[in-house]
């Protein structure tokens, strides 16, 4: 090798490593390379070169040159000329296989000196960087998603190739946590917001709870379809950019969810009011419709016509109602399809955030700090569902088009501004995605404890790009991990009852304790979800400080499941009866509960059995004024409430007032107290459950393991959950709203049946989770829940970095070796 060729070859090698000679005095501006008085130790400069060129060239075995070998040396001079080192023998032997081929093993037979000789240029005594390799046929965007190859881009923030130096300070775990948690919170907020407006949606579209349950399961279907494939391909690529793409998709889905309001809003409201009108009854101007501008001929459908022979029914079908019913049904089908597609897309979008973000955090923090980060992540995630309920309570206080309809939020005709939530949440998510796009593939190195210096990076084998043909093998490796499978089954049984409970918790509180919709949402947020967040943070701190064993963590998870199941059984006997409903007959086991007329006068009123408009008189409640035999009404100016008089079935009360009677049931306090204790106890298992999943599989398979669990939870938990619980809720219905012979939403539930079925099925499924947790506990001795982190100087490192120990560890399908 001549001096000229050696000079060119050495400079090309330096530049491929990121070296940028700035002057003639041996001071280099490389990325993390040690400077040693104008001379470089080739063992340090050689390390990144191995990681860049060792993919597919040979069998992966390269002889590292001895530390005494000098890559190049410089002599101070005015012409800034670099002099090649005298002895390149060791280096040439070490790079022999690399110099004879390209990066991917498809060399053209030219050496590096021949390939880049034409790039020599007098730039501060150095050479221009070689052009970007064109062997990879992927686009720039695909390359970005796969992580790229630039050393600078792997540790700095930026967009579209612009990575200013001041942005490097933001490439930290703390900044990523802020953006990631914002996305995580918005996702949880979106789902519980949708749950909080279910009553409004059911009333607007006249659909059953089972239908809304199927609608809610669409989000989980999106996760099932994409979880494992996404985590397999994106888990080894540029995870922040994949997460950002999911956030953009989620934003689009949220915006589309609000489209029905802007397309069909006015028409739906007009149709809904027509279907709620009854054409026969004494006139009452106070019940005119704001939307229809009804005249004084419009009537109150709740009053009694004594001795009347007309067919008085809210489901009477004249021509106008039939046409409106047909039009309303067509619009409802279109709107439900839009909702289904929106929730399906949002499920795909949130899969990227949930399954890629947590492993990304775990990879960038020490194993000792991981429990605390997991606790903060899961704890802050709880703010999303809580905020969703609170935001839903706020939005439903506004009328759907911000007009004054002539009645307040307690009126059955009230339709809240349900569409505000998707617009606001989608906008915030879109803004957060911009920040997520700017994060690098790998954050900067972990902080070292005081007094401990960083060790030089060891040779790292590059990760092989995931291939579709290897996907089944990776899935089989996860399925053969027995601990992961039992932990997955446990997660399904843990989350299925909790998801079902919270989906219909506001409705349960409304029915059981006669709360307003916005009050039920606030209680569900503060007494349930925020308590859960407190328990998660406390458990994370406990694991961080006490460092329990994996078996101890598994035992605690089983214990919390047993406590939760027992608590639900206790709550089955804590509720409020419906004995203050006139004519109520509870179920006796053979026949369902029902409400019958209380006097013969009501039998002659031809009342609409499907029109639930409760009134209160003398401490008793009646389905409607008609069922109480009331024949006249008036409006009380002080509070705009309707007063009914001349009630044949209430001789001792001169008048009755619309709405529920005051609830004298004191069991609400006991319910909230016991429920909060159960929620707190169960939430303390969340961090330990996450750590068991992350530690029971190979480090490279963490994202894939999350994908397996996410798919299983979606397929066997979250998809059937709202359908099962929706059917349970519908089974407790006493009065259905019916229009032209078609059942709509439920107007009144039997409190006893609702309580026993709703909480009973929750207790039973949670007990199955307890049984699965016992199996995990027996096998958990094979898991090291807090392994020594090599980058923190643990004894297990042996001078190697974490990446080396992961890449060198063989991946075998045997469960015992993967744990």
From Swiss-Prot:
Membrane topology note: Multi-pass membrane protein
One GO molecular-function entry: sodium-independent organic anion transmembrane transporter activity
Stretches with biased composition (Low complexity): 91-111, 144-157
Region (Disordered): 1-157, 444-466, 787-819
Domain (Kazal-like): residue spans on this chain: 593-651
Any GO BP annotation: transmembrane transport
Extracellular topology ranges: 196-213, 264-332, 395-413, 510-522, 575-667, 729-756
Subcellular location: Cell membrane
Cytoplasmic side: 1-174, 235-242, 354-373, 435-488, 544-553, 689-707, 778-819
Covalent S-S links between cysteines: 599-630, 607-626, 616-649
Phenotype caused by lack of the gene: Development is arrested at the end of the first instar larval stage. RNAi-mediated knockdown blocks ecdysone-dependent fat body cell migration into the pupal head. In the fat body, results in defective ecdysone signaling.
Amino acid composition bias (Polar residues), ranges on this chain: 24-34, 43-62, 71-81, 807-819
Chief localisation class: membrane
Function of the molecule: Transporter that mediates the cellular uptake of ecdysteroids, including ecdysone, from the hemolymph.
Protein name: Solute carrier organic anion transporter family member 74D
Organism, as annotated: Drosophila melanogaster (Fruit fly)
């Amino acid at each position: 090798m001549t001096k000229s060729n050696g000079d060119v070859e050495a400079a090309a090698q330096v530049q491929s490593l990121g070296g940028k000679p700035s002057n003639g005095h041996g001071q280099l501006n490389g990325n993390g390379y040690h400077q040693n008085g104008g001379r470089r130790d080739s063992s340090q400069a050689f390390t990144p070169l191995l990681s860049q060129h060792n993919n597919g060239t040979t069998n992966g075995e390269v002889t590292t040159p001895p530390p005494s070998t000098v890559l190049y040396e410089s002599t101070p001079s005015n012409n800034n000329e670099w002099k090649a080192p005298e002895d390149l023998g060791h280096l040439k032997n070490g790079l022999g296989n690399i110099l004879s081929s390209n990066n991917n093993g498809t060399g053209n037979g030219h050496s590096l000196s021949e390939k880049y000789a034409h790039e020599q240029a007098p730039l501060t005594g150095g050479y221009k960087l070689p052009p970007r390799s064109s062997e990879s046929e992927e686009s720039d965007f695909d390359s970005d998603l796969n992580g790229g190859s630039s050393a600078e881009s792997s540790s700095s923030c930026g967009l579209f190739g612009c990575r200013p130096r001041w942005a490097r300070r933001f490439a930290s775990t703390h900044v990523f946590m802020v953006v990631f948690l914002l996305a995580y919170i918005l996702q949880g907020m979106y789902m519980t917001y949708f749950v909080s407006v279910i009553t409004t949606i059911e009333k607007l579209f006249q659909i059953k709870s089972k239908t809304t349950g199927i609608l809610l399961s669409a989000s989980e279907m999106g996760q099932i379809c994409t979880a494992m494939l996404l985590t397999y391909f994106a888990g080894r690529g540029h995870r922040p950019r994949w997460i950002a793409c999911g956030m953009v998709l989620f934003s689009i889905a949220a915006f589309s969810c609000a489209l029905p309001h802007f397309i069909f809003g006015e028409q739906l409201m007009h149709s809904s009011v027509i279907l709620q009108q009854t054409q026969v009854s004494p006139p009452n101007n106070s019940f005119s419709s704001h939307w229809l501008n009804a005249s004084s001929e419009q009537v109150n459908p709740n009053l009694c016509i004594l001795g009347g022979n007309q067919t008085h029914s809210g489901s009477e079908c004249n021509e106008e109602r039939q046409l409106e019913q047909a039009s309303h049904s067509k619009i409802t089908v279109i709107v439900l399809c839009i909702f289904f597609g929106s929730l399906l897309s949002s499920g795909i979008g949130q899969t990227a955030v949930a399954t890629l973000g947590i492993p990304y955090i775990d990879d960038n923090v020490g194993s000792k700090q991981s429990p605390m980060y997991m606790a903060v992540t899961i704890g802050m995630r709880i703010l999303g569902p809580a905020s969703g309920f609170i935001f839903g309570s706020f939005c439903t206080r506004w009328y759907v088009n911000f007009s004054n309809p002539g009645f307040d939020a307690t009126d059955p005709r009230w339709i809240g501004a349900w569409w505000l939530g998707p617009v606001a949440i989608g906008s915030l998510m879109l803004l957060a995605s911009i920040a997520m796009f700017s994060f690098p593939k790998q954050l900067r190195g972990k902080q070292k404890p005081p007094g401990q210096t960083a060790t030089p990076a060891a040779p790292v084998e590059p990760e092989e790009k995931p291939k579709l043909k290897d996907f089944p093998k990776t899935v089989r490796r996860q399925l053969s991990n027995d601990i992961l499978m039992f932990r997955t089954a446990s997660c399904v049984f843990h989350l299925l009852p909790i998801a079902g409970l919270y989906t219909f918790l506001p409705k349960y509180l409304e029915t059981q304790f006669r709360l307003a919709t916005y009050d039920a949402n606030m209680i569900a947020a503060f007494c349930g979800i925020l308590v859960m967040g407190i328990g998660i943070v406390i458990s994370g701190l406990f694991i961080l400080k006490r460092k329990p064993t994996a078996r101890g963590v598994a035992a605690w998870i089983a214990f919390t499941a047993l406590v939760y199941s027992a608590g639900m059984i206790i709550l089955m006997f804590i509720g409020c009866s419906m004995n203050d409903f006139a004519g109520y007959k509870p179920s006796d086991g053979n026949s369902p509960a029902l409400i019958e007329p209380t006097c013969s006068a009501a039998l002659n009123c031809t009342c609409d059995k499907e029109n639930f408009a409760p009134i209160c008189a003398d401490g008793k409640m009646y389905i409607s004024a008609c069922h109480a035999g009331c024949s006249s009404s008036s409006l009380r100016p002080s509070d705009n409430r309707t007063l009914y008089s001349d009630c044949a079935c209430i001789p001792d009360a001169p008048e009755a007032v619309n709405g529920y009677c005051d609830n004298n049931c004191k069991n609400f306090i006991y319910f909230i107290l016991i429920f909060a204790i159960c929620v707190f106890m169960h939430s303390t298992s969340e961090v330990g459950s996450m750590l068991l999943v992350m530690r029971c599989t190979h480090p490279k398979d963490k994202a894939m393991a999350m994908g397996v669990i996410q798919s299983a939870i979606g397929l066997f938990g979250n998809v059937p959950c709202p359908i099962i619980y929706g059917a349970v809720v519908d089974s407790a219905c006493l009065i259905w709203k019916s229009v032209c012979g078609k059942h709509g939403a439920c107007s009144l539930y039997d409190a006893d049946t609702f309580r026993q079925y709703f909480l009973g099925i929750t207790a039973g499924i949670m007990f199955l989770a307890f049984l699965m947790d016992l199996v995990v506990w027996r096998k958990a001795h094979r898991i090291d829940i807090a392994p020594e982190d090599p980058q923190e100087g643990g004894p297990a490192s042996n001078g190697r970095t974490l990446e080396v120990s992961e890449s060198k560890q063989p991946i075998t399908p045997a469960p015992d070796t993967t744990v």
